[in-house]
């Protein structure tokens, strides 16, 4: 390293072994670099940048300048230089464009992007009535259109989209949009409550009642009357008509090129809109089903009551028709008989010896029961005969020493048993129930007639 003589240096250092002076440290660093201060220099070297105050350089570069290679038609304004002519950095920017800035051909391009239009609802007349209280304005994006040129370069065309808003605006007020940079976001304007009521002249042609589907009109119009719709009904119908294609074409991304303005009502004052017919039908179906279920339960309870009452009457008739005196004289061997309402007296299995005699008795009793069934039913309907019989009565007869071939001896015994039964039945009826005199007489006569017929049939056998 070629260094000048130390006599020409303008440097001073202390001779301490452990130096704590910052000036000495700076001197040592300059000497190590090979640039010590020299005394009596004829020309002054420019001061280092470290010894000067910092200079702020401002360059106006648009965000879209980064996409200059992909968008040759884009326009950029020339950067306004805030540097003075005397600054040493001016020579760097003078004569050639700074690094990162676009060319002059792009700066001087005559094609300029128009300003992105923003629809302000404060200056827009909304076709809503005076009762508008809560409104929500939604921006619904759609997919951007990307076209590829013949040379293989992708270009974004500036597509102006006419806003098919539900407000019925003119062409000058419609929200025409153009494709901008991907980072451009347009915030939705704030809604305004208007106090003016507008007629149907402000509405577009597709919002009229004639162009709307008839099924929607039937749901929203009370009673199915084809009257003129109010503005809020027309807005609601138009939204229902336009929601389906928007949902199909809605992209996943939030930022898009096409925007549509839609108005959603939160509070609807019309009862026809708040309660459409399909909701009423659901409510009616629920109430009708509940009523039908209650009616079925009541019918089942009534049927159960009707089933219980004939059982009691049947048991009472069984007790009245049973005659142990006749049964005791009609068998040689012990036979068990059961009284049934349909078949009269029938034998239990095991008594095969007397089957023929039992069949003859069954024929006589069934014919007797058919002749006396109707008057007995009427009789028991008028008088409550409360006799709790838990099971059908079984009568077991023991063998007797008398011969069946002698019917003359059996007749006095049957008459005696009949008289005892009549007296017993009469006393029991008087003690248990308080019947009328005519009913008592009818009951006694029926018992005597039944017993006479049974005696005749047994004597014939």
Curated annotation (Swiss-Prot):
Instruction: Kindly give the InterPro entries that the UniProt entry links to this protein.
Output: DUF4647
Q: Write out the biased-composition intervals (Basic residues).
A: 305-320
Q: Where is the composition biased (Polar residues)?
A: 349-369
Per the database entry, which stretches of residues form a coiled coil? none
Give the compositionally biased regions (Low complexity): 295-304
Cite the residue spans of the region called Disordered: 289-374
Name it.
Uncharacterized protein C9orf43
Name its species: Homo sapiens
For this protein's source organism, the top of the classification is: Eukaryota, Metazoa, Chordata, Craniata, Vertebrata
